[in-house]
Amino acid sequence: MSVKGVEMPEMTWDLDVGNKWRRRKALSRIHRFWECRLRVWWLSDAGVRETDPPRPRRRPTWMTAVFHVICAVLLTLMIMAIGALIAYLRYYHQDSWRDMLHDLFCGCHYPEKCRRHHERQRRRRRAMDVPDPELGDPARRPLNGAMYYGSGCRFDTVEMVDETRPAPPALSSPETGDDSNDDAVAGGGAGGVTSPATRTTSPNALLPEWMDAVHVAVQAAVQATVQVSGPRENAVSPAT
C-alpha cells in the first residue's frame, strides 16, 4: 500500500476502525471518545497473533482423569453429608432442630433467661399478652417449638423406639384402674419380648455420639424412604 509514492505498512483493524469513523459526518464527542477507546482496548489481529500465539490442544492425561474422579467423589460425599445431617436433625430433633442450630451457632445453650427472652419475643410477635403462669413451668416446658410454630412434616407423630434400651414399666391409669399394661410388661420381662405398644423412650435417649451420627442418620433416611414409598392407606395421619 502506497500513499503519495511512499510505501506504508498494511493498515490494521484498529486503525481501519478509526478511518471509518473519520469518514462519518459531524462526529460527536461521544463518537470521538469511543473511537479513542476502541484503539486503546481492541488489538488488531496481528497484535493478537503476536501476544497470544496459538497453542496445541493438550490431551487429557491419567492425572486429569484421577483429578476428575476425586472431585466427583468429594462432591458426592458432600451431598451425602448434607443429606445425612438434614435427616439426623429432622428425625431425631423433629421440631427442635431450629433450636439446636441456634444452640450450635449462637452458643446460647438455652438457659432460663434466654428461654424466657425467646418466649417474650414470640408473644410480642403474635400480639398476645399472656402471663407466664398460663404458659406453664419454664423448667418443664419442652425445648421443641411445636407449641409456638407448627411443622410441615407429616411424620411428626411417628414414635422413634430405641431398641437398645429396656422399656420402662408402664403405669396403670388411676381413673380406670386398668392393669393390662402391667401384665403386658410383666409378660414381656419374663419372656424377653416387650410389646411395641409399651415401649416408650425420651428424646434425650435418642441422641447418639458424634461417631455414630452418620450411621443413625442413614437408618433414619432408610426408614423415611420406606414410610414415603409405602401405601397411602397405611400412612400416619398428623391428627393421630
Swiss-Prot record:
Localization per Swiss-Prot or TrEMBL: Host membrane
Annotated transmembrane regions: 69-89
Subunit text: Interacts with host ATP1B1.
Location of region: Disordered: 119-142, 164-199
Gene: UL136
Main location: host cell
Disulfide bonds: none
Protein name as catalogued: Protein UL136
One GO location term (cellular component): membrane
Organism per entry: Human cytomegalovirus (strain Towne) (HHV-5)
Membrane topology: Single-pass membrane protein
Sequence similarity: Belongs to the HHV-5 UL136 protein family.
Protein keywords: Host membrane, Host-virus interaction, Membrane, Transmembrane, Transmembrane helix
